[in-house]
Amino acid sequence: MMREILTSRFFPSLFKKRLDFSNRVVLGLGSNLKNPLKILKNCFLYFKNHSKIGKIFSSPIYINPPFGYTKQPNFYNATIILKTSLSLRHFFALVFYIERRFGRQRKRDFKDAPRTLDIDIIAFNQVILRQNDLALPHPKWSERDSVLVPLALQQILFKKGEW
């Protein structure tokens, strides 16, 4: 069971625009199909270049084995903390759009199937919400190394003054 931490030009990365938006979002990113490093990089760049997103801070990439269905490639995971002026519903729609843009199929063959890009909204400000299509904070974030390890690495960088 291999686990590895990768760094690249964009992971970890801090980018600040002059605009400082009020909504703080924590995202979990995952990819294990096609070229996961390239997909995560391009996803980061998409968020970075979006006009409604200000600060964006990414973790290093955490490579770890899949959970659930294990006969698939390892996952490349990262977390992103960002500031946006988008409302929760508009941000949720943006996430769906980005996933589709990177080849994500919403209808999966089975639970925990491989995917080109998975973006989970872990938290949006302090919102607590339980609906059919969205639960905040994400109900299983605290059980997943794929979220906990990148968030812990971001916390270390934060304490060093990176955010």
Curated annotation (Swiss-Prot):
The gene is folK. NCBIfam families: folK (TIGR01498). Transmembrane segments: none annotated. It catalyses: 6-hydroxymethyl-7,8-dihydropterin + ATP = (7,8-dihydropterin-6-yl)methyl diphosphate + AMP + H(+). One of its GO terms (biological process) is tetrahydrofolate biosynthetic process. Pathway: Cofactor biosynthesis; tetrahydrofolate biosynthesis; 2-amino-4-hydroxy-6-hydroxymethyl-7,8-dihydropteridine diphosphate from 7,8-dihydroneopterin triphosphate: step 4/4. The lineage of its organism: Bacteria, Pseudomonadati, Campylobacterota, Epsilonproteobacteria, Campylobacterales. This is 2-amino-4-hydroxy-6-hydroxymethyldihydropteridine pyrophosphokinase. GO terms for molecular function: 2-amino-4-hydroxy-6-hydroxymethyldihydropteridine diphosphokinase activity; ATP binding; kinase activity.
